[in-house]
Amino acid sequence: MSIDQSKIRNFCIIAHIDHGKSTLADRIIEKTGTLTSREMQAQVLDNMDLERERGITIKSQAVRIIYTAKDGEEYIFNLIDTPGHVDFNYEVSRSLAACDGAILVVDAAQGVEAQTLANVYLALDHDLDVFPVINKVDLPSARPDEVAQEIEDVIGIEAMDAPRISAKTGLNIEDVLEQIVKKIPAPTGDKDAPLKALIFDATYDSYKGVIIFCRLREGSVKVGDTIKMMATGASDVVTEVGYFGAGQFIPCDELSAGMVGYIAASIKNVRDTRVGDTVTLVDRPCDEALPGYKKVNPMVYCGLYPADSAKYPDLRDALEKLQVNDASLQFEPETSLALGFGFRCGFLGLLHLEIIQERLEREFDLDLVTTAPSVIYKIHKTSGEVIDLTNPSNMPDPSEIEYMEEPYVSAEIMVTSDYVGAIMKLCQERRGVYISMEYIEKTRALIKYDLPLNEIIYDFFDALKSRSRGYASFDYEMKDYERSELVKLDILINKEMVDALSFIVFKESAYERGRKMCEKLKGEIPRHLFEIPIQAAVGGKIIARETVKALRKDVLAKCYGGDISRKKKLLEKQKEGKKRMRQVGNVEIPQEAFMSVLKLDEE
């Protein structure tokens, strides 16, 4: 089955969160008859339950669509739906590497937002042809002409003849399909050259092993060929090749240059396949690997522990399987005195952490305890050594530290002019450094700040949305490290330090954070038969304390009247028992207590 390259279009849809990417993908699939109306459902390409529930796209998904254009020719579209959240930026860049062009969806009511810009720049970095589409024109608040002007002014791409569509009702979807044929270039690549294919994703199937999703740049591959991964050197015999139907794999005879498809080769070892690697043939390898993706570095680290320590091997297995499908997840084993064996995992942001945690609990049926997230600090020791600190409990003694540095990000916040003051105040509270502010149009401003990553990973996004009544949008990228006054805040429960609750704070906010933390824990830890002191300490000095009062049994219930000394004796005996119990008693700390660190600023 030979396919004419000039009839293939590989493209993806990029947009800010909630501007209608997945809905547009649904309409394109429906209009081209890829699925029957019975099989159609909202968010067709979001096939994880989690994605449907939250209404967001987490994984990029690919689908092949056949479209008969107005010129009577049949075209093959390979559409890749991408996520919009900052946390899944790497998913977007992987999808872009498999495409030749991109559709930029902009909401006719909201206009250009922070992540619209970020995603467009990503697409332009990959040399893709981008054309805009203005969505949601059926909304009463839609202002398509102003938005088209805004796209031209802010992003600098031609938008006056952009299709005005409503992905929800299906208005003008044909215009988009025709634009895809006209504006997105056909792929290039020699079918007879040695195989060169880029892995842009992978998934694990318990029957077929690891299935790799790839874009063929050159050459062709069919069943029976022996393929080799260029980065890991692993080789396997191909058992199946094919392309993506909506929600299913469709086998075919061979894949050739310009096509997007999957290869199954009974790859059992999860570590053999790396996203961004190049696949070639063993007997006819290509000269050099394709440039992969820039390696993504985790921004946030946290500990994941199985609630039942016997499940530790299951957790490792589950993390390895998720890593096939999610290249940015990193993990290494660690132990905690309070929680036993677990893993220190690196994530791209808090949403990423939450999603991974939920996927582990749902897909692998694990019960997890998560510790508070922390960023990577650089510690300059007096000996001249520089170490990276991902876990606060590994912080060296203060006497060995010359100074510490923390990561900063460059943040761009787009907000309507009514809320500029509130947003600037929020950034100042979070130790932000003001960079610039410009008005994009009369009512909207773009504010730039440098902020410590430590201040934004917890609840900055929620605070931003609540202070701007949902009007602000936010995008950030890593800048570099800057020197800062930081201290480690330890939490002692019943006079014992709980390593999993330690975290690093800015020196001036240590007292405030410590006090809030103790109050919060007091509400989370259940009462025991003995009094439990909860203390916050910085370097051995207690800076805050709360007490969980003891439950007491009424030992005087059996005394009717009688001598006071009898009652005293019973009360003294109870007091003695409580004292002894406090020395040997264990305090049960619920999972909510570990997570309460995150929600300190919400009150």
UniProtKB/Swiss-Prot annotation:
Topology in membrane:
Peripheral membrane protein
- Enzyme class, broadest EC rank: hydrolase
- Enumerate the spans annotated as tr-type G domain: 6-188
Q: What is its main location?
A: membrane
BP-aspect Gene Ontology terms: positive regulation of translation
Q: Which branch of life, at top level?
A: Bacteria
Query: What EC identifiers does the entry list?
Result: 3.6.5.n1
- Do you know which CDD domains this protein is assigned to? EF4_II, EF4_III, LepA, lepA_C
Any GO CC annotation of this UniProt entry: plasma membrane
Sorted alphabetically, which Gene3D superfamilies does this protein's record hold? 3.30.70.240, Elongation factor 4, C-terminal domain (3.30.70.2570), Elongation Factor G (Translational Gtpase), domain 3 (3.30.70.870), P-loop containing nucleotide triphosphate hydrolases (3.40.50.300), Translation factors (2.40.30.10)
Instruction: Recite the UniProt keywords alphabetically.
Output: Cell membrane, GTP-binding, Hydrolase, Membrane, Nucleotide-binding, Protein biosynthesis
The GO molecular function terms of this record are: GTP binding; GTPase activity; ribosome binding; translation elongation factor activity
Report the catalytic activity.
GTP + H2O = GDP + phosphate + H(+)
**Per the record's keyword annotation, is Coiled coil included, yes or no?**
no
- Where along the chain is GTP bound? 18-23, 135-138
Q: Where in the cell is it found?
A: Cell membrane
Q: What family does the entry list?
A: Belongs to the TRAFAC class translation factor GTPase superfamily. Classic translation factor GTPase family. LepA subfamily.
| Protein role | Required for accurate and efficient protein synthesis under certain stress conditions. May act as a fidelity factor of the translation reaction, by catalyzing a one-codon backward translocation of tRNAs on improperly translocated ribosomes. Back-translocation proceeds from a post-translocation (POST) complex to a pre-translocation (PRE) complex, thus giving elongation factor G a second chance to translocate the tRNAs correctly. Binds to ribosomes in a GTP-dependent manner.
Q: Which NCBIfam families match?
A: lepA, small_GTP
Q: By its UniProt entry, which HAMAP family does this protein fall under? A: LepA
Name recorded for this polypeptide:
Elongation factor 4
Species the sequence originates in: Agathobacter rectalis (strain ATCC 33656 / DSM 3377 / JCM 17463 / KCTC 5835 / VPI 0990)
